[in-house]
Amino acid sequence: AYRHSVFQHGYTIRPQGYKTNEIAELLGLKGNGEKHAEYVIANHISKFIAYFCNSDRHKVQELNYLDTVTDPKAQIFVKSFYDYIVAQSRLFLSKMDKGEIEITHDFYLKKFQLSNPVLNYDYILFDEGQDASPAMLDVFFKQKATKIIVGDTHQQIYGWRFAVNSLEKAAFTTYQLST
């Protein structure tokens, strides 16, 4: 994904991602007069972008960010700014796509997934399959190669990054490993 997306488009990577205040500044976000509202909006934009980039969807509009917001107060806030959050998320993604700002690792993976790559390998081994993003799985499942997923369902640690357990998503024969 890195070689295909970053080099081909001449992108520069932002190693640590963007902080909330940086997103607010880059987008010139405006709140509603409530203290720090623009930073709360920026935080939701950051989360929405991560949600989209890790999803198997092709457009931001295909996702409902509210599905990821569990706190009742946050839901009320997001509902009142939803269209603005979506528009600003799309603008931020556009800025990365045009090379106006550095891209994130999530972004180049998404760019790779959206390119529908064909990987010319006979076998593809997907390690740590319990922590796969839907974007990764979309690429993996579309390949013609013999596919193998290795993982441990009891070691899933990236759910907060929208990872899913690919071991449950694949209709593959399961083999138990032992020592």
Predicted regions and their residues:
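An accessory alpha-helical subdomain
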Residues: K30-S80
